[in-house]
């Protein structure tokens, strides 16, 4: 099974704290290289529309070249690892747990270009990333009974999420939630079960209206949104063809403190009322008109290329976590 996601991000960051004295002879483990990499990773996490925050794993290459006038171009090749924090989770990525290998880890390789003005400290950031999970063969070789990653669109995954959400809504008098995104699904063994992770938001519908396909529910007005991230296990066989009805399940939902104006507040409107499974697998995601305000609707420039990122001394840098 092979999953591919491409993120194409373009935006502006103003007020950089980086020194105006930009070194051009950086090695991948230099402190300044780490600062540039952190800028790119921070931008990815602030504008990523789906799934999980990413953490830096390896700086594979860095090249700093003079551009026009006061501009300096920084080209980076980065390897990132998926964390367990959803993009809506306000937890700083530095405090997020890296998804362990036995839980079917996912890596992301990114080409980044940062245009830095040494006079104004203004930055333009361009990033293109491809995400790939560890192979099923490697997971099973190292841990034969570990859960295997499934597509968020897998019928068992979708049915499990809907089943757990319906059970929660039945128990919450006066509150109705809808799925914002199905972020992860896994097939577990001994006992056989389906493990799912998904984000939900409180809507302004009654329980009856929520089950009416002709009624469109909307998130509560600003300041009243209850957003939660849920992890659940539904115990059922992969051979089951019917939707779950009376299966045993375990679940835990944590309310996320997403403030109005938070960098990801746009995600609610991006997801609600649309197909709620993550498009991150077997798909390409590009910035379009509905992207966050910081995005510009144009393609990433062609000068993020190998000719700017030929191997340099001291690269790649050290592996901060593990290599897939």
Swiss-Prot record:
The record marks 140-141 as: Cleavage. Pfam families: Cystatin. InterPro entries: Cystatin_dom (IPR000010), Cystatin_Fetuin_A (IPR025760), Cystatin_sf (IPR046350), Kininogen_Fetuin_HRG (IPR050735), Prot_inh_fetuin_CS (IPR001363). Homodimer. One of its GO terms (molecular function) is cysteine-type endopeptidase inhibitor activity. Residues 22-130, 141-254 form the Cystatin fetuin-A-type domain. It comes from Gloydius blomhoffii. Disulfide bonds join 28-315, 85-96, 110-129, 143-146, 205-217, 230-253, 287-291. Keywords: Disulfide bond, Glycoprotein, Metalloenzyme inhibitor, Metalloprotease inhibitor, Protease inhibitor, Repeat, Secreted, Signal. Expressed by the liver. A motif (Cell attachment site) lies at residues 23-25. Belongs to the fetuin family. PANTHER family: ALPHA-2-HS-GLYCOPROTEIN, FETUIN. This is Antihemorrhagic factor jMSF. GO terms for cellular component: blood microparticle; extracellular matrix. It is found in: Secreted.
